[in-house]
Amino acid sequence: MFRPEEMVKLEVITLNRYKDTLLTYLHEAGAVEVREVKVELAQKDTPNEYHRKAASYSISMSRLVEFLGTYRKAAGGGIKEFFFPKEKPKRTYRYERLEKLIKDVEEFLGKVEPEIKAIEGRMNSLSTEIERIKEQIGILDILTPLNIDVSYLRHCGVVEVTVGLVDRTRVKELADALKKETENHVAIITKEASDKALVVIVNLARDHDKVNTLLAKFSVEKLEIPEGEGTPKELMKEYSKKLAEKEKELEEAKKEASKLAEKYYDDVLFYKELVDNERDKSTVLPMLARTNMTFALTGWVPRPDVQKILEGIKRITEGKAYINVREPRKEELEEMPVKLKNPGWARPFEMLTEMYGVPRHDEIDPTPIIAFTYSFFFGFMLTDFLYGLIVGIVAALLVKGHKKFNDGTYKFAYILLWSAFFTMLLGALFGSYFGNAADIMLQYITGDQNAHAWRLLDPLREPMPMLLAALAIGLAHLFLGYTLGFVIKWKNGDRKGAVFEQLPWMIIIIGVALLASQREGLDAAAKAILGTGIALFAVGELVINGGLAALMIISDFFGFVGNWLSYARLMALALATGGIAMVINVLVGMVWAIKFLYIGPIIGLIIFFGGQLFSTAINALGAFVHALRLHYVEFFGTFYSGEGKRFEPFKSKREVSKLELEV
């Protein structure tokens, strides 16, 4: 706790014949972050033809999964599935070598891909044909006002017929231009067609170029005349029959696709996951060094996993390997990855730390601290017992349903569960139950207009004590941050930074706290401490910034004041939550007074529950964001950089498959 997991450097040299099996073992173990071997005398390894095939088959099967997934019957879903998702069953694959896996994949694809591609091609062809028929029906609908055999509208010999749509306002201008260019050797028919005019132009074939130039100039949208004979209405009936037939064929094809999805979807997904992991596994090959007989790899391993990894390497290589495990050198510390290490109760809060950035090797891990302070700030800003209860119930259900997955949803819900506890606690202390709803109920039941729920403090009626409490919390939070910064810098040998950058603010905060306490006998001591802190701060600015000291004194001082005052948002959001809830209650009271056919109470209940649920969601979102901001900007700015490199192990991703490695 407070310190990341210890890391050691692993170096391995072994025979090439163990490469595939060893990489597969490390990939499944997921405990080593592989790094590039920096050796000038050896060659870099490269993916072979089987790795390239794995990448190719991954793309092919992604398309098959996408197609089959579209026509697969949805399993589960809904609210229950959201809260309590089921684990996907995993099939075991006995891994011997990459060549054998590729052979199995090719055998599987040779069986299922032709079936799937055939039905996919048939469906694509039918869909294209249906769209073509719909387009032709649309054209026939436009031609309906002409009421002539559409065969007359096609080109025939020396006469050329063009049918199209043009802007109504340009019809006369177009007709005049055509007559002029063709020396009146043209016939023009116009009909109204929705927002444009339908024009039929009959001209001599020799005038083709002249006519087409004018059609382009006047933006005439040409229509392709559908095949067949008869009036547009007669042909529309024929095409509608064709459309119905093709749509029926498409539905039959979709049913066949659904059957194929039920039959093959899980298998395709299984083999896709196998080749996906092989493709990902091949990405480390360029990091390895090799000779004709051997290869070398290096990487970082968390100390607790070292023994397991060493035993696995020795077993796979039959002891024919050079293995070196050593402490990181001084020049390697900056590139050493960081894996957070926290007790179970704080582990989900690592998500908040990682969103900002993991600590450097010489920093502390703030996760255990923010596990408490973040939840407390969230609760302080939401500050309503029943809002906290709603958030807590939802979070508890998600925690129960997602715990086995340990996924992002579980971690987020766990954080909300702790935050809901503090929301309920502080809501009870401030007497807020859907705002003043509890007070209204008590007054209605007892008939006493002064009755109210027990509370330690009413934020809406006594905002100043609430503001002072928020600022006091902020001062304590900043003091903790500066203290941690002092300890870190002192321990890392930066004594000047500890004394001149961290210590002055610690002393100033103590002085401010003593002055604010207004206790008799402490006034002189408080002023002396505050003066000492300010003097040390000024000296520190001179030592660190030299000629810019005067400017930096103003900047840093007002920066500190700004950070401190930022904690006033604790009070502001608490008041906003109570205020919104109270407004909803006032609206409900106004509507409730309508007694006609019980409309008032019915609408009032809808407004009450709908409004309070909306208020819970919007205020919880605000509390979540602002609690993060107080940590990321104000708190972390005092001691934490988050510039470490996150530990990213060479690890497989498996949801539906499980590998059994044959050694």
From Swiss-Prot:
Keyword Ribonucleoprotein: no
Subcellular location: Cell membrane
Annotated GO biological process: vacuolar acidification
UniProt cross-references to InterPro entries, sorted A to Z: V-ATPase_116kDa_su (IPR002490)
Segments crossing the lipid bilayer: 376-396, 412-432, 468-488, 497-517, 534-554, 568-588, 589-609
Gene Ontology molecular-function annotations: ATPase binding; proton-transporting ATPase activity, rotational mechanism
Main subcellular location of this protein, as a coarse class: membrane
Keywords: Cell membrane, Hydrogen ion transport, Ion transport, Membrane, Transmembrane, Transmembrane helix, Transport
GO cellular component: plasma membrane; proton-transporting V-type ATPase, V0 domain; vacuolar proton-transporting V-type ATPase complex
The UniProt record lists the keyword Transmembrane helix: yes
Membrane protein topology class: Multi-pass membrane protein
Role summary: Component of the A-type ATP synthase that produces ATP from ADP in the presence of a proton gradient across the membrane.
Family assignment from sequence similarity: Belongs to the V-ATPase 116 kDa subunit family.
Subunit structure of this chain's protein: Has multiple subunits with at least A(3), B(3), C, D, E, F, H, I and proteolipid K(x).
UniProt-recorded name of the protein: A-type ATP synthase subunit I
Species in which this protein is naturally found: Thermococcus kodakarensis (strain ATCC BAA-918 / JCM 12380 / KOD1)
Lineage, broadest ranks: Archaea, Methanobacteriati, Methanobacteriota, Thermococci, Thermococcales
Encoding gene (name): atpI
